[in-house]
């Protein structure tokens, strides 16, 4: 009897995993993608140490770069919260988070997406990644007094770099 119950439980779990996976695959990722900040606003506030796209900004609207401080190399003073937040590019590559379509990462994808480019399989991957980042927003809301920008500065910088409003 124990073996049957265990097998039934395992089969039920596998069935639930399949159902959940199917639901996730059928989600309209474009409907759930609701970034709170535009690329322009993110850069105005200060992200990625001011080192955007290796200074190759020609494919993006010039208006995005008004009131934006740009640096040839990463400069932590240009980040909104004056902290380093995130992992190295090498780590991104090792984790498989860099794709040939956007070799500079999520922000490059997001800028191109905002400019109208659609590559469905890439959009799905990047929107899933963006959605998973919401946990950091929830951590700030749970652990910080509203408006205390000194609380969890690294997480605030991180959510800013994922188009979430850090002023919570």
Give a label for each model feature.
Residues 113-137:
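Short linear, low-complexity motifs centered on an aromatic residue
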Residues 14-101, 105, 117, 135-158:
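Compositionally biased, intrinsically disordered low-complexity regions enriched for acidic
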């Amino acid at each position: 009897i124990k073996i049957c119950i265990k097998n039934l439980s395992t089969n039920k779990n596998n069935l639930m995993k399949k159902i959940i996976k199917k639901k996730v695959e059928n989600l309209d990722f474009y409907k759930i993608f609701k970034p709170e900040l535009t690329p322009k606003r993110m850069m105005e506030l200060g992200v990625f140490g001011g080192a955007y796209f290796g200074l190759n900004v020609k494919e993006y609207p010039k208006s995005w770069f008004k009131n934006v401080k740009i640096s040839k190399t990463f400069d932590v003073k240009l980040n909104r919260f004056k902290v380093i937040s995130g992992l190295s590019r090498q780590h991104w590559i090792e984790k498989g988070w860099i794709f040939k379509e956007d070799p500079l990462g999520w922000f490059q994808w997001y800028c191109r997406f905002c400019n109208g480019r659609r590559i469905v399989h890439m959009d799905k991957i990047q929107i899933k990644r963006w959605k998973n980042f919401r946990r950091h927003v929830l951590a700030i809301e749970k652990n910080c007094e509203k408006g205390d920008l000194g609380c969890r500065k690294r997480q605030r910088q991180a959510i800013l770099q994922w188009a979430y409003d850090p002023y919570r």
